[in-house]
Amino acid sequence: MKNILILLIGLIGLSCNGNSNKSANQLWNDGQQFRSEEKLMESITSFKSIIKDYPLDDLAAKAQFQIADIYLNDTKDFEFAVEEFEKVVKEYPEHEVSKKSLFMIAYIYNNYLEAYSDAIINYNLFKEKYPSDELIPSVEYELEGLKDIQATIDSLNSIVNKKTNL
């Protein structure tokens, strides 16, 4: 009886973690397939399994980026997309997707969340970290569009500072 109970517990454990025997590449392919079928939660689960089970694999950073991209482009949850892109920048700072993630953070703040100060901060951080990157012209374009907004922000801050000093 005890052996049957142990066997049942083991089988339940295996069925709950169906991704445990899959390679990072298999999980990546599953995540991509689920996404193409619009099974977004399954896709995210596959990508999270890569991050959890293969944290040092090159696909871990790409999986984190894909999660952020799903929230940005598929679910349109822009705040959560920013959080997920921030994880890429924090956890994988040297990976190729980190700089694109930093750009996307600024882009989302500017174009979707209307958090212009945050957009300016992140665009300037991008310029500082990647001064010769191919995205610099896009960063400059976005910052140019934010100049008037920045002037308004500065003016409002000046008014607030004057009132608090009275």
Name each model feature, range by range:
Residues 4-7, 16-166:
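Acidic, polar-rich low-complexity tracts and alpha-helical solenoid repeat scaffolds
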